[in-house]
Amino acid sequence: MVNLLGEILLTVGALLFLFSFYEAYWTNLESNQLQHQAEDQMEQEWKNPRQKKNLELGEAFARMYIPAFGSDFQFAIVEGTTDDDLLRGPGRYVDTQMPGEPGNFAVAGHRVGKGAPFNDLGNLNACDAIVVETQNSWDIYRMLPTGDDRAAEAAACLSPEQVERVVAGDYSAVPGRMITLPGDVETINPIPGTTLAADPGMESLMTMTTCHPQFSNSHRMILHAMLVRSDPKTDGYTPPELESN
């Protein structure tokens, strides 16, 4: 009986090891290949002057950079948040806004395996930059305050008007980072935590969501950032946020 129990435990241990290997290594290889394919397709689309009507699920349409994570951090963002979409890279929630639009451009990404693009989101701080490159523009977002001195953190990177909205206005309840339950869908609304529809008078936000804690999907880590600048794409131009990286 003891020998049988030992064999069962060894078998279970081996299966867990194989599953961990699959999640942490093999899915990364698969995701990396799909990410490169999506990136290549996007580059071809950008070189084509014709404007596409609608994005297809899994199709890349933008590229994101987080300078705090180093110069090698860049991922093509795809349309959709299904398992297949997120295997290709970070995916846009299809009912949210596009980069630079008033409202909320919300993106989901894996934290473990499958490329793990959002593995280090917990290390970002207030005012850290998230740069989104589209076919025609560079959109620069800055992470919203995370500490107790909300006014000082906001003033370090936002305009005076944005500081007022973030400290005492309609964005005063929107944190830079929060932990919540998977069903908390209001975090990706045009103004997170409200049910307001997107409006031209709103700020342009970017929200990133991922599983929390690491190796678990019991909760979600949510990061909110606000657009501070949109630069048109011109030959040879790179935003200073990336040049200093």
Protein language model features and the residues they cover:
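Solvent-exposed, non-transmembrane regions of membrane-associated and secreted proteins
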Residues: 3-4, 9-245
